[in-house]
């Protein structure tokens, strides 16, 4: 950030392309905090490679109150795993690009996909479901349910949304529903949510809002 006090008629403030690009970054770490980018095996990645943003320092929490499981999942090897995906450039600037944790931020509310998925799976016509966040001009992200129905079963978008309204807070119900034949998974059975999100976020520099 640059603060100046000059008559606009006689001064023009310009930045290089490199400097202007860094306006989209989260900045550089504080001197008392270490920030690195880790891969899926908790190994450090070189500049420019996308991975999970991890943090270490005296200002980092020691753990979650009375929740050792969450603590062990988030604090590993002395590093706090933020759940955000990003890159760090050669100068140490960090860019947040996507979210590793299965969370949607809509209208300022943190919404966990798993909670919504567990409810939708209770619907008698639903075989599988994946809940993702898609871009929304008003809410930042909107909740979208991608549903595979059981063979021979039928359900409409309204059926799924109304079912969620009966069991969830209003802000957690999906704003849209898409029906597909099968939910894509990797060989280990993990749902490929990034693949599902891609067509909605294509063209966006960042996968978070």
Give the predicted meaning of each segment:
Residues 3-8, 38-39, 56:
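Short beta-strand-to-turn element immediately C-terminal to the catalytic PLP-Schiff-base lysine
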Residues 20, 35-36, 85, 182:
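Generic short beta-strand
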Residues 41-44, 57, 62-66, 73, ...:
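AMP-binding/adenylate-forming catalytic core of the ANL superfamily
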Residues 35, 129-131, 177:
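Generic structural signal for residues in well-ordered beta-strands
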Residues 1-33, 47-51, 61-62, 76-77, ...:
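Conserved ATP-binding loop and adjacent catalytic segment of the adenylate-forming AMP-binding
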Residues 198-209:
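Acidic/polar alpha-helix N-cap and adjacent early helical turns
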């Amino acid at each position: 950030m640059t603060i100046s006090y000059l008559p606009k008629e006689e001064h023009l403030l310009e930045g290089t392309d490199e400097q202007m690009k860094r306006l989209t970054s989260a900045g550089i770490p504080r001197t008392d905090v270490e920030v690195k980018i880790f891969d899926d095996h908790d190994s450090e990645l070189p500049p420019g490679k996308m991975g999970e943003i991890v943090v270490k320092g005296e200002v980092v929490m020691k753990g979650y109150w009375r929740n050792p499981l969450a603590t062990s999942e988030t604090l590993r090897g002395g590093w706090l795993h933020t759940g955000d995906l990003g890159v760090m450039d050669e100068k140490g600037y960090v860019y947040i690009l996507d979210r590793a944790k299965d969370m949607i931020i809509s209208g300022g509310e943190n919404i966990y996909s798993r909670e919504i998925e567990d409810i939708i799976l209770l619907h008698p016509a639903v075989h599988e479901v994946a809940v993702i966040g898609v871009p929304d001009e008003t809410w930042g992200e909107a909740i979208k349910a991608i549903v595979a129905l059981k063979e021979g079963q039928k359900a409409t978008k309204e059926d799924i949304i109304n079912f969620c309204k009966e069991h969830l807070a209003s802000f957690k119900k999906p704003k849209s529903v898409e029906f597909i034949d099968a939910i894509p998974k990797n060989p280990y059975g993990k749902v490929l949510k990034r693949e599902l999100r891609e067509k909605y976020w294509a063209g966006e520099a960042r996968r978070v809002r």
